[in-house]
Amino acid sequence: MEIDHICFSVNNINDAIDYWESIFEYKQMTAVIENSLQKVKVTFLSKENSITIKLIEPSGNNNSLKSFNIRGGGFHHVCFKCDDLSQKINELREKGLKLLVPPQPGEAFNNNNIAFLLAKNGLNIELIDTDEKAGLILNSLTFGLDDKKK
């Protein structure tokens, strides 16, 4: 397992994109997409030799994420990429992690399955077994493109 990204919950995804780009020199690598299952807007940001950042903004009736943001938002989860999602879920459950969201299509990952687990100390874990990102506008290996779409 290796870290794919870390995720931050924000109130306004476009403002957050501007902030991460101007302060931390990240680049938007995917268009903002609407994830109807998780009821969030999603985008990924990248920076050479750094970890990928995922930003999520609550949409629709996502009351739990809206409540999270009222309390300040911020760090939401760490995502690990594994070789076999079902097998890794079973392994982590045997080690005491609690399954929060069973495998379901993740629109931010071109509908490949994702799952969420809860580790000790309230750490939310997302699991994926794909490299695909929906709405790719900037390859994570290519930097300096100005053709962003928000």
Enumerate the language-model features and the residues they cover:
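Short, conserved turn/kink motifs that form compact alpha/beta structural patches or helix kinks used as
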Residues: 58-61
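Structural preference for solvent-exposed beta-strand-turn elements
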Residues: 26, 105-112, 121, 128-131, ...
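N-terminal beta-strand motif that seeds the catalytic metal site of vicinal oxygen chelate
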Residues: 1-17, 73-80, 133-150
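Short, charged/polar, Gly/Pro-enriched secondary-structure boundary elements
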Residues: 50-53, 122-125
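Short, conserved beta-strand edge motifs with alternating hydrophobic and charged residues
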Residues: 54-56, 79
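Vicinal oxygen chelate
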Residues: 3-12, 43-46, 66-91, 115
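Core segments of cupin and vicinal oxygen chelate
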Residues: 8-51, 88, 94-97, 102-110, ...
